[in-house]
């Protein structure tokens, strides 16, 4: 895959439920801690190396941001780093929270 694929929040949710696709959240730490999809890896510049060590490059990766815009650049970057299949979630976390409020968790302090 040379180009990431944009997918709907519904498609992302189904892939997430199957458990075969890695989900990364690239929002700022405060937003991530306030609420994110369970199991989402908080991908930042400082956690990228860890993510790349822990994730098989042939495992599909979905990228979530706030609204589905920033995730496009991050998805393309992950492809350039060697991941085979990368998706950008249209609508981002805002669409996820609106459609699947029962599937949001927050960090306990």
UniProtKB/Swiss-Prot annotation:
Protein name per Swiss-Prot or TrEMBL: Thiosulfate sulfurtransferase GlpE
Superkingdom field: Bacteria
Entries under CDD domains matching the protein: GlpE_ST (cd01444)
Highest classification ranks of the organism: Bacteria, Pseudomonadati, Pseudomonadota, Gammaproteobacteria, Enterobacterales
HAMAP family registered for this protein in UniProt: Thiosulf_sulfurtr (MF_01009)
Start and end residues of each Rhodanese domain: 17-105
GO terms for cellular component: cytoplasm
Keywords: Cytoplasm, Transferase
Pfam families: Rhodanese
Family to which this protein belongs: Belongs to the GlpE family.
Entries under SUPFAM superfamilies matching the protein: Rhodanese/Cell cycle control phosphatase (SSF52821)
NCBIfam families: PRK00162.1
Major enzyme class: transferase
Record-linked InterPro entries: GlpE_sulfurtransferase (IPR050229), Rhodanese-like_dom (IPR001763), Rhodanese-like_dom_sf (IPR036873), Thiosulf_sulfurTrfase (IPR023695)
Function summary: Transferase that catalyzes the transfer of sulfur from thiosulfate to thiophilic acceptors such as cyanide or dithiols. May function in a CysM-independent thiosulfate assimilation pathway by catalyzing the conversion of thiosulfate to sulfite, which can then be used for L-cysteine biosynthesis.
Catalytic activity reported: thiosulfate + hydrogen cyanide = thiocyanate + sulfite + 2 H(+); thiosulfate + [thioredoxin]-dithiol = [thioredoxin]-disulfide + hydrogen sulfide + sulfite + 2 H(+)
GO molecular-function terms, A-Z: thiosulfate-cyanide sulfurtransferase activity
Localization (cell): Cytoplasm
EC numbers: 2.8.1.1
Active site: 65
GO biological process: glycerol metabolic process
Keyword Lyase annotated: no
């Amino acid at each position: 895959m040379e180009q990431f694929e944009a997918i709907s929040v519904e498609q992302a949710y189904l892939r997430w439920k199957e458990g075969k696709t890695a989900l990364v959240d690239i929002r700022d730490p405060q937003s991530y801690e306030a609420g994110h999809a369970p199991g989402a890896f908080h991908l930042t510049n400082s956690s990228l190396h860890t993510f790349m060590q822990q994730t098989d490059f042939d495992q599909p990766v979905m990228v979530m941001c706030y609204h589905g815009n920033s995730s496009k650049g991050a998805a393309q970057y992950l492809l350039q780093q060697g991941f085979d299949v990368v998706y950008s979630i249209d609508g981002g976390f805002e669409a996820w929270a609106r459609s699947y409020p029962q599937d949001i968790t927050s960090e306990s302090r």
